[in-house]
Amino acid sequence: MELKIHDFQLSILRELLFRPNARFRDLKKVDITNDHFTFHLKQLVKEGLVIKQNKVYSLTDEGKEFANRMDTEALRIERQGKIAVGLHAVRLRNGKTEHLVHQRLKEPFYGWYGSQSGKVRWGENPLDCAKREFREETGLTGKFTLKGIVHYHHFHQDGRLLEDKYFWIYKVENTKGDFMEEVPEGKNIWISEAKYRKLKNVFATFDEVREVLNSKKLLYLDRARFVKSY
């Protein structure tokens, strides 16, 4: 969960961005009592964002990373798009291609269908994330080929932006392992193209998936979706 920071604490972090080593009097730019200000300064030290040495305050490495995401004029932490992987597995069964689809059984988008996916963890590269997520969500391994990056904006019908995600899309072939039909987050189903096209509430249509998987070059696409519920 994102760390919640009080406006007074953001003010302190902003000062330390531009004044790497500052004393108490240098940081107190807001009109509050010394006790009140000291409380917020101690909270930043407790959270590991600020360090005090010889009566001088400075940002820790964690504090620098956190404060660097700040809009210093608006005095707020900027929200950024999430980075994830999308994993579309295919196989031949009786001479026909089948696609592995995941029915999501958790919020948001409960009941929707799409490819396996997962967030890229801190310090993890997309390919390692793809292999880990696919193994955890399906029990399978396979050959992973990066096909493109798709940037999704999901909007509510009233115009509110609900999600902003960048997906590294991998095609997964030659799958093997102990297939898991059900996992805590949903169900995994191998289906034909005809059945895929009949699915409702899909994150990407079959034609959109095929456009990426069949591309001869690495693609970058921006796509927007408007939904009734989230």
Where are these regions (language model features)?
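Short hydrophobic alpha-helical segments used for membrane anchoring or interfacial signaling
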Residues: 90-92
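Conserved Nudix-box catalytic region and its N-terminal flanking loop in Nudix hydrolases
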Residues: 21, 28, 32-34, 96-136, ...
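Acidic, metal-coordinating catalytic segment for phosphate/diphosphate chemistry
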Residues: 56-86
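Unchanged
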Residues: 120-144, 151-205
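Conserved beta-strand and immediately adjacent loop positions that scaffold enzyme active sites
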Residues: 86, 98, 187
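Short amphipathic alpha-helical interaction segments
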Residues: 30-46
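Nudix hydrolase/Nudix homology domain
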Residues: 3, 7, 15-33, 110, ...
